[in-house]
Amino acid sequence: IEEFLREFNGEGIQHIALICDDLVACWDKLKANSVPFMTAPPETYYAMLHERLPGHGQPVDELKTRGILLDGTTEGGEPRLLLQIFAQAQVGPVFFEFIQRKGDYKDGFGEGNFKALFESMERDQVERGVLKVEEKV
């Protein structure tokens, strides 16, 4: 956001979101046409998906291979999901977001992914010994 504000001297359109019926197939077509995507989250993000969204029913290996994020809810046994991926900025700091909504997912814009990404990066750092977990006494 900071880069955008600096580049354009204020507010404006930061990104453009496009909805897809099949985000995995969409990603494959975009990648075949050399669209660059933002760096995929660490392995731990995908390892934590079943904890965060039990019973989500999505092909984690396909999501992980492509760096696709998954958010939503599985409460009541009916997954309501948002799949999302971000292309690298190609028009100044403006970037494209590609999404797919599944079930009756109408609310939200992937807010749960912000927390999940942070937690997965932290877990990855702990596993690599870069970050030490302090024990509470």
Annotate each language-model stretch with its function.
Residues 1-137:
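Glyoxalase I/VOC metalloenzyme domain signal
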